[in-house]
């Protein structure tokens, strides 16, 4: 049976630097730099995939489980444990069949929300995400998914909250439940922190408290106060 080709375009600072697809015979991705990227002054991966070497005009991804068949510098944009839990729930809710090219679908879902500078197209978009975010509902659902994982059942009334949680949480790295949000200090309004924002909004990573007795969020708060990040 012939597999449908999936192509993901990879962008950096507005420039399409390469195209990524899946080789079902090699069971990994294949990536090719664009001529537009080769004209740029920078080299994003000079040690392993230097653009000056013709041999690396196209190359296969790393089959190691850590990289899921992607080139190492692209695999870094994949969701970690928490984001993967949300993504798996999203696949189930949308009746999407899992295939070996799933890493490409993950990158498309991440789109412009990766923690680094890379962006991926085509991108999944959802207008519902632009609405105000109810932090209490997010925290309750995040705790349910994190603690139940394989058995978490999403009710119809939670479906929109689930969509927002997947959107806000898949790109944030790490194993603990979290979301990237924006907070208006004047009105107290919460929104997605991964879209263009009006004035008076500041972006934060919100870490939700887990159901067990481990004070992980409190410990991280203490460390952040001891060693504040200076921007």
Kindly give the residue locations of the regions a language model identified.
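Phosphate/dinucleotide-binding and metal-coordinating scaffold of catalytic cores
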Residues: 1-231
